[in-house]
Structures are given as structure tokens and as C-alpha cells.
From Swiss-Prot:
Keyword RNA-binding: no
Task of the protein: Part of the twin-arginine translocation (Tat) system that transports large folded proteins containing a characteristic twin-arginine motif in their signal peptide across membranes. TatA could form the protein-conducting channel of the Tat system.
GO cellular component: TAT protein transport complex
Protein name as catalogued: Sec-independent protein translocase protein TatA
Length: 69
């Protein structure tokens, strides 16, 4: 995960704890989780749209070549 070891992650978590306090951590984690969920949803939608366009292109080329023969 980004080349970070266990000690580095613990240090980062301690710094976050000091900066935001224990009361804000659940709120921050919830916001981060929602953001990641939205990002993954958008990524999936883009992949599905891309795949549908790629799948349509050979069909159009196939029907065009069969009508020309």
C-alpha cells in the first residue's frame, strides 16, 4: 500500500489523531468511506459505458460489411 510499512501507518494515524482529536475521527472516517464509495461507483459507471461503446463498435462494423457484400 504505497510502500508504507506498519510503523509509518501508525505514525500517520497518531498525527491524524493529534490534529483532529478522537471525537472527529469517526466523522472523518465516515466521510472518507462515502467518498471512496462514490469514486468506485463513478469508476464502475465509466467502465460500463466504455465497454458498451467498445461492444457496439464491432457490431456496427459487422453489419456495415455484410450490407456491402
Amino acid at each position: 500500500m504505497f510502500g508504507l510499512g506498519g510503523q509509518e501507518l501508525i505514525l500517520i494515524l497518531l498525527i491524524i489523531l493529534l490534529l483532529f482529536g478522537a471525537k472527529k475521527l469517526p466523522e472523518l472516517a465516515r466521510g472518507l468511506g462515502k467518498g471512496m464509495k462514490e469514486f468506485k461507483k463513478a469508476q464502475t459507471e465509466i467502465e460500463e459505458e466504455f465497454n458498451s461503446v467498445v461492444d457496439e463498435k464491432p457490431k456496427k462494423e459487422k453489419t456495415a460489411s455484410s450490407t456491402q457484400s
